Design a protein with these regions (language model features):
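Alpha-helical segment proximal to the catalytic Tyr-Lys
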Residues: 115, 157-161, 226
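Active-site helix of classical SDR
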Residues: 110, 144, 152
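Residue(s) in the substrate-gating loop at a strand-loop-helix junction
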Residues: 128
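Substrate-binding pocket helix/loop in short-chain dehydrogenase/reductase
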Residues: 85-87, 91-99, 198
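Short, flexible catalytic-loop segment of classical short-chain dehydrogenase/reductase
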Residues: 169-180, 184
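Canonical Rossmann dinucleotide-binding motif of NAD(H)/NADP(H)-dependent dehydrogenases/reductases
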Residues: 2-27
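Short C-terminal tail/terminal secondary-structure segment
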Residues: 84, 218, 229-242
Length: 242
């Protein structure tokens, strides 16, 4: 039985991934904000974590360490957005929050759990199509997600051959992320994108749903991707073709 830790497990993609991995026999450890875990209880071991708080990360890591197991997989889904605005109109507090929540916190939580990984383990991070296909108003988020790609490739080199490290980079996904984010809002804010307009401009005619993302993540966790590291899988229905 493989053991997989998922940071951001209570979000829209995370909940589907928990169910899929559990159904396939994996031992899943879910980590997320306490508010998220209360709002969306999961049928697996759940540990509260706030990736913006180093003490919280240390506490969560120590709890996992106390379980006396090795992680075969680590998926870091954490992240959120704070609306759409041009960079020149963005205040520093919003910029800092965006970088902290989408890059620094992801780096810190991944770094602390990394020593618990098993030999030949797999780490999957979550970037975004915006890291390469820039859209006005999403600059800070795009900068953070471009950093995730750089982090992923760096870890892939530095941790080889012991670990594989890859990323998925979705376009917009039909989850609460588009309406404020799980755990950091009531999940009922106005959608940050025009879904119909974006869907009509996408070759496959819609935006993603969670299973469009969880399938590639499970592939990257599995032995089927055993000769892949430092790679980015773009999941966007053809909206961006590198």
């Amino acid at each position: 039985m493989s053991t997989v830790a998922i940071i951001g497990a209570a979000g829209g993609i995370g909940r589907v991934l928990v169910d899929e991995l559990s159904a396939n026999g994996s031992n899943v450890i879910a980590l997320d904000l306490p508010t998220s875990l209360r709002a969306h209880p999961l049928k697996c071991t759940s540990i509260p974590i706030d990736i913006l708080d180093t003490e919280s990360i240390d506490l969560a890591t120590n709890i996992v360490r106390s379980m006396n197991l090795e992680l075969d997989g680590l998926v870091n889904l954490a992240g959120y957005t704070k609306g759409v605005r041009p960079l020149v109109e963005m205040d520093l507090a919003t910029f800092d929050d965006t970088i902290m929540g989408n890059l620094r916190g992801v780096f810190t939580s991944t770094r602390e759990l990394l020593p618990l990984m098993a030999q030949n383990g797999s780490i999957v991070t979550v970037a975004s199509g915006l890291a390469q296909s820039i859209r006005p108003g999403h600059g800070a988020y795009a900068m953070a997600k471009a950093g995730i790609i750089a982090m992923t490739k760096t870890l892939a080199i530095e941790e080889s051959p012991r670990l594989r490290v890859n990323a998925v980079a979705p376009g917009p996904v039909q989850t609460a992320f588009l309406t404020g984010g799980t755990g950091v809002s009531n999940e009922d804010q106005a959608c940050i994108i025009d879904v119909e307009k974006l869907a009509s401009a996408t070759p496959l005619g819609r935006i993603a749903i969670p299973t469009d993302v969880t399938g590639p993540i499970r592939f990257l966790l599995s032995d089927q991707s055993g000769f892949m590291t430092g790679q980015v899988l773009w999941i966007n229905g053809g909206a961006y073709m590198p």
